[in-house]
Amino acid sequence: MDPAEAVLQEKALKFMCSMPRSLWLGCSSLADSMPSLRCLYNPGTGALTAFQNSSEREDCNNGEPPRKIIPEKNSLRQTYNSCARLCINQETVCLTSTAMKTENCVAKAKLANGTSSMIVPKQRKLSASYEKEKELCVKYFEQWSESDQVEFVEHLISQMCHYQHGHINSYLKPMLQRDFITALPARGLDHIAENILSYLDAKSLCAAELVCKEWYRVTSDGMLWKKLIERMVRTDSLWRGLAERRGWGQYLFKNKPPDENAPPNSFYRALYPKIIQDIETIESNWRCGRHSLQRIHCRSETSKGVYCLQYDDQKIVSGLRDNTIKIWDKSTLECKRILTGHTGSVLCLQYDERVIITGSSDSTVRVWDVNAGEMLNTLIHHCEAVLHLRFNNGMMVTCSKDRSIAVWDMASPTDITLRRVLVGHRAAVNVVDFDDKYIVSASGDRTIKVWNTSTCEFVRTLNGHKRGIACLQYRDRLVVSGSSDNTIRLWDIECGACLRVLEGHEELVRCIRFDNKRIVSGAYDGKIKVWDLMAALDPRAPAGTLCLRTLVEHSGRVFRLQFDEFQIVSSSHDDTILIWDFLNDPAAHAEPPRSPSRTYTYISR
């Protein structure tokens, strides 16, 4: 900045500082003349500086003690001194008490009424000389470069008090607000607006559609409802299951819409509430016990019970007392294959995409090819019946009536080696479960023992059941166990505390499973009970509210069950496998979602 411009800037600053406070607040033309002012304002700057030395104090106050412009701490500026003078750059600014009180009263009234937090000064008639000097100041200002304007405004704002900062903030705030969703497409950045809105949930997305036509266009053109449904399918197993069962999963994760001639987003917009309706129906059916029932009869000349099972979307694999493993088609309920080789009852099994592993009362563990049905390996270690087994991530744990637990390393189906034998139970070990941290075992000796998965060292014992323990499941910190004392107990594995005791079964609790919402148990009384898991973990929940529903269809002891969000599959001593479907008959409830111009086929299976 050259010397001439510096002089002009100094004069303009002196002029601005010499104006009464109320005129500062009315002079908005300076901000209007320089757009860069809108991005400079910082409410954190200080207030006016008063009385730099003692001589200024004497000059300004005629020998009297200085009078404060800024009130004491915690004051609301209720009063000001009758006549206060500030010395700023050797210029005197007179602030009358009348003007200050008027401004303060207007501010209080606005805040009390809740209409606005902006302080509005009392209107006053501006003199002709002021108008002339203001125009001259603006003229000087416009002659400067943008950097000089910025420097001047920064210095000017630093001379103001918080009262003036508040008014400037109220003036600038509307200028700084921008509708970015509307502005981005106008600059060819539609994809950024769509990406921002794609993080909204359904309720917020509905609200966004109603903001204006441009927001509605962005949500429609961006296929945001499709992206929302795809996100839910990726993260939620219930949504994944519905996509498969209802058939609308075929329209997801594809760039091409179901019908290129129809408004594509309308299909997914209509589909979303349909999915929510299905989810609400499922939850209601679980609580009310409404279900459709399918029955597989496994009875044969030698069969006297179905001891174990596991299922997926295509098949059910069952282990029977007649020494066989039967694989059933889940759609047709027909037996597709029978695996033979065990010389005793098949008491436990588990399978993945490659192998089926079974344990038997013949004390052996056998490995089968899941697709071909061929026996790949036979493990002989236990000296009595193998009661339960689990395998995952190259590791398998088996337990036996011989009171021992065997830990195996699985390099391949044909290369399985014994790593460690865990001994500590005083009766048959009925069930095991494990993850990367703990191995958990339960026994007829009434105890649950916890072992370190990596070192196989003993960690702790969970005591509480009054009789032998027949079943358990372990996940995260929670262990749920069932016993021949007819109770179910919930445990915190880290501290060993019993969190809740569930009572309701009349005989031994033989099988139990849980997910994030519910516990499902089966017992020798032939009943299957559904419990509210979240309520069971709440110590304030009354015991009478924990059992949601009791299902009675089996005519014999319930040996094993498995469930997901839609169904329970159970097996019993009555030689049947029951499929309890809580979505009911999908074809009876399916309706095609409609778009404004087309009708789509809503597929059900």
Swiss-Prot record:
It is found in: Cytoplasm; Nucleus. The keyword Nucleus applies. It comes from the Eukaryota. CDD domains: F-box_FBXW1A (cd22182), WD40 (cd00200). Residues 182-228 form the F-box domain. Expressed in heart, brain, liver, skeletal muscle and, most strongly, in testis. Disruption phenotype: Mutants have normal circadian behavior with normal PER2 expression in the suprachiasmatic nucleus. Residues 190-228 are annotated as: Required for down-regulation of SNAI1. The keyword Nucleus applies. Keywords: Biological rhythms, Cytoplasm, Nucleus, Repeat, Ubl conjugation, Ubl conjugation pathway, WD repeat, Wnt signaling pathway. Ubiquitinated via 'Lys-11'-linked polyubiquitin by some cullin-5-RING E3 ubiquitin-protein ligase complex (ECS complex), leading to its degradation. Deubiquitinated by OTUD5, promoting its stability. SMART domains: Beta-TrCP_D, FBOX, WD40. Residues 128-177 are annotated as: Homodimerization domain D. One of its GO terms (biological process) is regulation of cell cycle. InterPro entries: Beta-TrCP_D, F-box-like_dom_sf, F-box_dom, G-protein_beta_WD-40_rep, WD-F-box_domain-protein, WD40/YVTN_repeat-like_dom_sf, WD40_repeat_CS, WD40_repeat_dom_sf. One of its GO terms (cellular component) is SCF ubiquitin ligase complex. One of its GO terms (molecular function) is ubiquitin ligase activator activity. Pathway: Protein modification; protein ubiquitination. Transmembrane segments: none annotated. The N-terminal D domain mediates homodimerization. PANTHER family: F-BOX_WD REPEAT-CONTAINING PROTEIN 1A (PTHR14604:SF5), WD40 REPEAT PF20 (PTHR14604). Homodimer. Self-associates. Component of the SCF(BTRC) complex, composed of SKP1, CUL1 and BTRC. Direct interaction with SKP1 with SKP1 occurs via the F-box domain. Interacts with phosphorylated ubiquitination substrates SMAD3 and SMAD4. Interacts with phosphorylated ubiquitination substrates CTNNB1, NFKBIA, NFKBIB, NFKBIE, NFKB1/nuclear factor NF-kappa-B p105 subunit, ATF4, CDC25A, DLG1, FBXO5 and SNAI1; the interaction requires the phosphorylation of the 2 serine residues in the substrate destruction motif D-S-G-X(2,3,4)-S. Binds UBQLN1. Interacts with CDC34 and UBE2R2. This is F-box/WD repeat-containing protein 1A. It comes from Mus musculus. The gene is Btrc.
